[in-house]
Swiss-Prot record:
Listed Basic and acidic residues bias regions: 83-94
UniProt-listed NCBIfam families: rpsS_bact
PANTHER family: RIBOSOMAL PROTEIN S19P FAMILY MEMBER (PTHR11880), SMALL RIBOSOMAL SUBUNIT PROTEIN US19M (PTHR11880:SF8)
Gene it is expressed from: rpsS
Region (Disordered): 72-94
InterPro entries named among the record's database cross-references: Ribosomal_uS19 (IPR002222), Ribosomal_uS19_bac-type (IPR005732), Ribosomal_uS19_CS (IPR020934), Ribosomal_uS19_SF (IPR023575)
The name this protein goes by in its record: Small ribosomal subunit protein uS19
UniProt record similarity statement: Belongs to the universal ribosomal protein uS19 family.
Organism: Desulfovibrio desulfuricans (strain ATCC 27774 / DSM 6949 / MB)
Gene Ontology CC terms: cytoplasm; small ribosomal subunit
Lineage: Bacteria, Pseudomonadati, Thermodesulfobacteriota, Desulfovibrionia, Desulfovibrionales
Pfam families: Ribosomal_S19
């Protein structure tokens, strides 16, 4: 269920301060954040965020297509190593 329109999008205050200073100074440095829950706003387009995935910071360059999504959507937290091979099937092929 989406967030109510009268409430508006959620962005952490500390992250918005970083974005405002970066835009005002036209600073293109990577902005490090743990705020995966923050919504991407149009002011953030063109900035690069280092979003924490629980282990490390994943660089995310914000484009126009990402507006309205959450920062955490672009920093996966789980790694997929594939399913284990079936040992019985391998033994039968010999």
């Amino acid at each position: 269920m989406p967030r109510s329109l009268k409430k508006g999008p959620f962005v952490d205050g500390h992250l918005m301060k970083k974005v405002d200073t970066a835009v005002a100074n036209s600073d293109r440095r990577v902005l490090k954040t743990w705020s995966r829950r923050s919504t991407i706003l149009p002011e953030m387009v063109g900035l690069t965020f280092a979003v924490h995935n629980g282990k490390k910071f994943v660089p995310v360059f914000v484009t126009e297509n990402m507006v309205g999504h959450k920062l955490g959507e672009f920093s996966p937290t789980r790694t997929y190593h594939g399913h284990a091979a079936d040992k019985k099937a391998k033994a039968g092929r010999k």
